[in-house]
């Protein structure tokens, strides 16, 4: 079976390398989101974090090739989607807590991604689809707050739609490029530059520069975390099912819930603990039984 544009469609089980990469990316993703939420101005802080990622990528740019022509439609499309994603995410963090916004935004996409990638010809084992559904349920149980501001919930759901869209595009683009790390580096240079230009035009370059002088540590920590995490996910998606990788990455809500509880005063209820454990149980169902090198050996 082949996916979009004649690309091979990875099948279950997920390689262990992809699992490790996705789980590491989950921790890194929760960290940079906590930095954005924990600052004084989520929009400015997100610009600094993504600008920091762009700076890291810019240093690496001379050592990677320009993405092939087949990858550029996906690269430009995901770049376009990341602009409203960033603006919506910053607005959501202004309206609600880290635990609630992050959970709703990251808990909703996995099943949407699974359905979208199935339509493109990428399939998982039935138990893995069940695992993705369990992850989504656990994520939503971890942080969904029925009495949270309606604006925060609505914005988080809009963020979720952009996440589902760019995740599918990321997987297709990484495979089309043949060089997922190079693809990620080019993406971060363009994305960070574009988003900082938007924020600079909106708030003014002097205001952004002043904010950066007093909050540069967020860029120094969050920038590399974001770039490395995204690169790991793209690398994993280049040879493993997009739906499975995305679902495992969303277990980051357990990390975000802990950060919100430990450092931001978010409550840690029994429901959230049970939801986190449910999400981890779903992750176990998505995980593989064989490492990648054994799968390759059996295909030869």
PLM features: what roles do these ranges have?
Residues 52-56, 104-118, 133, 190-194, ...:
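Alpha-helical transmembrane segments of compact multi-pass small-molecule transporters, enriched
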Residues 40-45, 88-105, 121-123, 175-182, ...:
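Structural motif at transmembrane-helix junctions in multi-pass transporters
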Residues 2-80, 86-96, 137, 144-157, ...:
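Membrane-interface interhelical linkers
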Residues 26-30, 79, 83-87, 107-114, ...:
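Hydrophobic/small/kink-forming positions within alpha-helical transmembrane segments
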Residues 57-67, 113-127, 163-179, 225-242, ...:
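Hydrophobic alpha-helical transmembrane segments in multi-pass integral membrane proteins
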Residues 22, 46-47, 75, 102-103, ...:
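Hydrophobic/aromatic positions within or immediately flanking transmembrane alpha-helices
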Residues 228, 232-294:
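C-terminal appended segment following the main domain
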Residues 51-57, 111-117, 124-144, 271-290:
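Hydrophobic transmembrane alpha-helices of multi-pass small-molecule transport proteins
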């Amino acid at each position: 079976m082949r996916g979009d544009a004649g690309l091979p469609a990875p099948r279950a089980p997920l390689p262990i390398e992809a699992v490790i990469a996705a789980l590491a990316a989950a921790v890194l993703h929760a960290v940079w989101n906590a930095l954005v939420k924990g600052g004084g101005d989520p929009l400015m802080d997100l610009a600094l974090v993504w600008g920091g990622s762009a700076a890291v990528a810019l240093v690496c740019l001379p050592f990677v090739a320009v993405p092939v022509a087949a990858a550029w439609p996906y690269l430009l499309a995901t770049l376009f989607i990341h602009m409203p994603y960033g603006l919506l995410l910053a607005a959501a963090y202004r309206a609600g807590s880290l635990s609630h916004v992050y959970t709703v935004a990251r808990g909703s996409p996995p099943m949407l991604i699974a359905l979208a990638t199935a339509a493109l010809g990428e399939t998982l084992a039935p138990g893995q689809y069940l695992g993705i559904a369990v992850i989504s349920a656990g994520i939503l149980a971890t942080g969904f707050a029925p009495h949270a501001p309606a604006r925060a919930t609505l914005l988080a759901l809009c963020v979720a739609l952009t996440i589902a869209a760019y995740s599918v595009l990321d997987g297709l683009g990484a495979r089309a490029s043949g060089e997922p790390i190079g693809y990620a580096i080019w993406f971060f240079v363009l994305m960070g530059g574009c988003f900082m230009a938007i924020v600079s035009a909106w708030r003014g370059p002097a205001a952004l520069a002043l904010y950066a002088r007093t909050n540069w540590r967020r860029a120094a920590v969050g920038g590399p975390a974001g770039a490395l995490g995204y690169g790991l996910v793209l690398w994993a998606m280049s040879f493993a099912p997009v739906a499975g990788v995305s679902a495992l990455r969303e277990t980051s809500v357990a990390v975000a819930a802990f950060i919100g509880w430990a450092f931001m005063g978010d409550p840690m209820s029994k429901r959230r603990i049970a939801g986190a454990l449910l999400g981890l149980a779903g992750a176990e169902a998505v995980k593989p039984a064989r490492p990648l090198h054994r799968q390759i050996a059996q295909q030869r």
